[in-house]
Swiss-Prot record:
Gene Ontology cellular component terms for the protein in this record: cytoplasm
PANTHER family named among the record's database cross-references: 1-(5-PHOSPHORIBOSYL)-5-[(5-PHOSPHORIBOSYLAMINO)METHYLIDENEAMINO] IMIDAZOLE-4-CARBOXAMIDE ISOMERASE
Gene: hisA
TM annotation in the entry: none
Catalytic activity: 1-(5-phospho-beta-D-ribosyl)-5-[(5-phospho-beta-D-ribosylamino)methylideneamino]imidazole-4-carboxamide = 5-[(5-phospho-1-deoxy-D-ribulos-1-ylimino)methylamino]-1-(5-phospho-beta-D-ribosyl)imidazole-4-carboxamide
GO biological process, one term: L-tryptophan biosynthetic process
Species the sequence originates in: Acaryochloris marina (strain MBIC 11017)
CDD domains: HisA
Alphabetical list of InterPro entries matching this protein: Aldolase_TIM (IPR013785), His_biosynth (IPR006062), HisA_bact_arch (IPR006063), Isoase_HisA-like (IPR044524), Isoase_HisA-like_bact (IPR023016), RibuloseP-bd_barrel (IPR011060)
Name by which UniProt lists this protein: 1-(5-phosphoribosyl)-5-[(5-phosphoribosylamino)methylideneamino] imidazole-4-carboxamide isomerase
């Protein structure tokens, strides 16, 4: 299973939000490029970048920083935040970004998502961010009545390469991922699901690993890496390619609820 470190960009700095609240941001570094290089050095196979300013304004804002990160790394980078039209997606991919993550536009213009998936096969991922199972949009500032699983099914039809599912109420909280929701989504669709939000420990990753067989192929980890609750190198040894353990993960009530 992929363990993907996350860098959230706000005003050019590396930050973490609490439950998606821009007023509860914590700065972890003034130099996102150095942070990205550190994750690569520790064995990351992907990097997840979110332009929080872009998510809020509707167009990418931290382009210079994104370009610098992509140029500094050898591993592929996926980027989300403010990608709501073809020009913005093309602009990012031309910078060398491997995958663009579409969010709000999946609700507001699903036809465009389908067109982009056809134009850029395997490079378009849909990020579904949800509160209590319902999709949030526009930088998590608005919540729709659309169910996350229903949107995921539509995006499979559109041609998305994968779904990144973020449970907003767990994001930045270190409370553990929403295992039941991830299981429901993975069982409902035929493309990979990447978990995001709440991962706080190796145990959480092992519980996600139990879902790998049904399609949960990766976990995006943010705050727990910055607080050192998780060491990336240890996480990769535990659940990544060539993992050291073949012991079944904890399948207690938290995993099977």
């Amino acid at each position: 299973m992929d363990v993907i470190p996350a860098i959230d960009l706000l005003e050019g700095r590396c930050v973490r939000l609490y439950q998606g609240d821009y007023d509860q941001s914590q700065v972890f570094s003034e130099n996102p490029v150095e942070v990205a290089k550190a994750w690569e050095a520790q064995g990351a196979q992907w990097l997840h970048l979110v332009d929080l300013d872009g998510a809020k304004t509707g167009q990418p804002v931290n382009l210079d920083t994104i370009a610098a990160v992509v140029e500094a790394l050898e591993i592929p980078v996926q980027v989300g935040g403010g990608l709501r039209d073809r020009n913005r997606v093309t602009q990012l991919l031309n910078l060398g970004v491997r995958r663009g993550i579409l969010g709000t536009v999946a609700i507001e213009n699903p036809d465009l998502v389908q067109e982009l998936c056809q134009e850029f096969p395997d490079q378009i991922v849909v990020g579904i961010d949800a509160r209590e199972g319902r999709v949030a949009t526009r930088g998590w500032l608005e919540t729709s009545e659309i169910l996350a699983v229903d949107l995921a099914k539509r995006m499979v039809t559109a041609g998305a390469a994968a779904i990144i599912y973020t449970d907003i109420q767990r994001d930045g909280t270190l409370q553990g991922p929403n295992i039941p929701m991830l299981r429901e989504m993975a069982e409902a669709i035929t493309i990979p699901v990447i978990a995001s939000g709440g991962v706080s420990s190796i145990t959480d990753l092992l519980n996600l690993l139990a879902l790998e067989a049904i399609g949960v192929t990766g976990a995006i980890v943010g705050k727990a890496l910055y607080t050192e609750d998780i060491a990336l190198s240890e996480a990769l040894r535990a659940v990544g390619p060539g993992r050291w353990q073949d012991v079944p993960p904890d399948l207690g009530s938290s995993a099977l609820a």
